[in-house]
């Protein structure tokens, strides 16, 4: 996904007005180690970093009709977020599991701690009306039975249109 995003930026008729850094970090589950290192030791001056958008563990099992932007209520990025969602015909949903405190448990939080506006954007659970599956249940079931197990492999269902939308 990140390579596709990079290729998309590369193919733009005009380059973005600002540089785009695509960083792949690791060790989130071990305490946000990779993102903390990058946020602490960026490859450019920290004051030149205007935003961080984190994509982690996207669920592309079904069509996407909404997104959940963790940290939006604490960020100055709500205006461009709303414009992008509107452009993609996506609704913006609230944190479906506030008790999990995902805002402080994901890589974007390393940037928040350094004063860099950041969002962690996940696909929500709303999907097309003809989908008979309650995605809030099925996605959570996948997470508890498949995620980080030997079954978490490339044979998973994958909705390419959902990936393109995300």
Task: Set out the residue ranges of the language-model regions.
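Metal-dependent peptidase/peptidase-like ectodomains
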Residues: 25-131, 136-137, 143
